[in-house]
């Protein structure tokens, strides 16, 4: 999901319906640009729990799954976006299918870390005080358990491309003025994955969200490193898009998986938003990207 909450009841219904009828109720949903509970009112409110729970309740009302919401709220005014909105990434998850590993959640300025191959705090933000994330949404790591297997899902919304040249604009070659900042964020993410795999080589990782860069970019390469597979990069080239901007289809939304999940993933962008206008019923300006993972032959992991 890529949009700002809280939003009108009509918009909430559109989003909820798309989750139920278009992407068929995934076990875990990454949410992007969730606003705090009073939207753009700049009064110091940072929690977005009511915003997330409003969406979860609407999904249930419409006959969908009974999702739970989890987040770590940002510090006031520190994560970019519209002043007062305090946008953040977060998760919905279906507790009938997956378990959020029960631990104390990290604090807004507390860096996620591993202990004995599992998240020490859950969920937790990745290196939130690092200068690379100044005025940018911090990535959120959450560890889930599915049939005895553990997977760390990392939600991301990297630095905006605002100020970059259009890919097919008048200025050629196009200059990506903001990419250097995203590459630094990407290195932080890859280092985090490396540490998790160093402690627990069987740990599964899935990185999702709006990376604000293309599947072939240096940002994507830095995230993947030698540890991850970029599923969008391996997808049919004609179908590699989740966003439409200035006349071109683009794949800003990607999914990376750890190599121990290679051959066990079915991936697809679901084109229900980017190619349509609001009057045609779209729920967001980004398409959702979806991955199905098969854990049936996974080796049991240490507790």
Describe the residue ranges of each PLM region:
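Divalent cation-coordinating acidic motifs and surrounding scaffolds
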Residues: 1-301
């Amino acid at each position: 999901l890529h949009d700002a909450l809280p939003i009108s009841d009509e918009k909430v219904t559109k989003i909820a319906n798309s989750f139920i009828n278009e992407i068929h109720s995934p076990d875990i949903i990454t949410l992007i640009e969730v606003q705090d509970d009073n939207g753009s009112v700049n009064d110091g409110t940072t929690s977005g729990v009511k915003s997330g729970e409003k969406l979860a309740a609407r999904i249930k009302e419409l006959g969908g799954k009974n999702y739970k919401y989890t987040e770590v709220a940002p510090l006031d005014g520190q994560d970019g976006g519209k002043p007062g909105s305090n946008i953040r990434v977060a998760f919905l998850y279906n507790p009938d299918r997956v378990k959020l590993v029960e631990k104390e959640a990290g604090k807004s300025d507390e860096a996620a870390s591993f202990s004995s191959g599992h998240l020490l705090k859950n969920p937790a933000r990745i290196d939130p005080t690092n200068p690379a994330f100044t005025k940018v949404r911090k990535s959120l790591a959450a560890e889930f358990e599915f049939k005895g297997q553990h997977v760390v899902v990392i939600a991301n919304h990297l630095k905006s491309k605002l100020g970059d040249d259009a890919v097919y604009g008048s200025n050629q070659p196009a200059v990506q003025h903001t990419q250097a900042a995203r590459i630094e964020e990407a290195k932080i993410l890859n280092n985090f994955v490396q540490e998790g795999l160093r402690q627990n080589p069987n740990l599964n990782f899935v990185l999702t969200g709006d990376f604000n860069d293309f599947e072939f970019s240096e940002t994507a390469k830095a995230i993947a490193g030698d540890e991850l597979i970029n599923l969008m990069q391996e997808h049919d080239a004609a179908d590699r898009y989740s966003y439409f901007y200035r006349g071109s289809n683009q794949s800003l939304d990607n999914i990376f998986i750890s190599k121990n999940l290679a051959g066990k993933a079915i991936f697809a962008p679901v084109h229900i938003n980017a190619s349509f206008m609001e009057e045609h019923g779209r729920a967001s300006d980004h398409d959702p990207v979806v991955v199905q993972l098969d854990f049936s032959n996974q080796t049991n992991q240490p507790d």
